[in-house]
């Protein structure tokens, strides 16, 4: 797992975040080298030797886990463990929304109704935008509707281009967020975005 939180059992006293034994923390799950060109310019997400917890290295599905001290973030008092575990999907969704410059009143098409896509839809609506969530799995879309997502499209049952054209009055989506990682979905972003619109991957 890479969406995890825990209690610090041991940590160097001189860590940069001022974390102490007993603190509740979330982790930055993306382990980067710190030396390659992307790392040197602050784009650690593009590290040439990037390792992701739970994907490339063992993650948080264990009672104890060792992680670099400078990649721990203290969580506030009163935050539940369940809320803390959502820090990673929330930050990814927020980053995509911010990078795309989403504004209130705009339409945001989000491809993929997994954790990132669902949170992105809720964030878009919290910003006052209209979220349009696309997926092939009806159960995910039903769950999205139960969370209050304004529009859902089952891409396997209806034409997303025509449906988004209908929803937006012909303008198409002002921002398209691709949250599935599937090659056909990445290509489809170009069909869903408005003229002068933005795509975030």
Where are these regions (language model features)?
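NAD(P)H dinucleotide-binding glycine-rich loop of Rossmann-like/cofactor-binding domains
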Residues: 31-111
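Glycine-rich beta-strand-centered segment in the early N-terminal region that forms part
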Residues: 1-37, 76-78
């Amino acid at each position: 797992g890479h969406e995890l939180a825990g209690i610090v059992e041991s940590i160097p006293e001189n860590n940069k975040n001022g974390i102490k034994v007993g603190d509740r923390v979330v982790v930055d799950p993306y382990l980067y080298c710190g030396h390659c060109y992307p790392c040197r310019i602050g784009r650690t997400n593009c590290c040439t030797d990037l390792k992701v917890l739970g994907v490339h290295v063992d993650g948080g599905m264990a009672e104890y886990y060792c992680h670099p001290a400078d990649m721990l973030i203290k969580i506030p008092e009163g935050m539940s463990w369940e809320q803390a575990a959502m820090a990673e999907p929330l930050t990814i969704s927020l980053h995509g929304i911010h990078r795309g410059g989403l504004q209130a009143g705009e339409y945001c098409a989000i491809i993929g109704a997994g954790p990132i896509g669902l949170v992105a839809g809720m964030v878009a609506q919290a910003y006052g935008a209209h979220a349009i969530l696309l997926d092939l799995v009806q159960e995910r879309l039903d769950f999205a509707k139960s969370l209050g997502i304004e529009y859902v499209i089952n891409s396997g049952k209806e034409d997303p281009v025509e449906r988004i054209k209908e929803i937006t009055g012909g303008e198409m989506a002002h921002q398209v967020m691709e949250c599935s990682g599937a090659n056909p979905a990445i290509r489809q972003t170009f069909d869903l975005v408005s003229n002068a619109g933005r795509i975030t991957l």
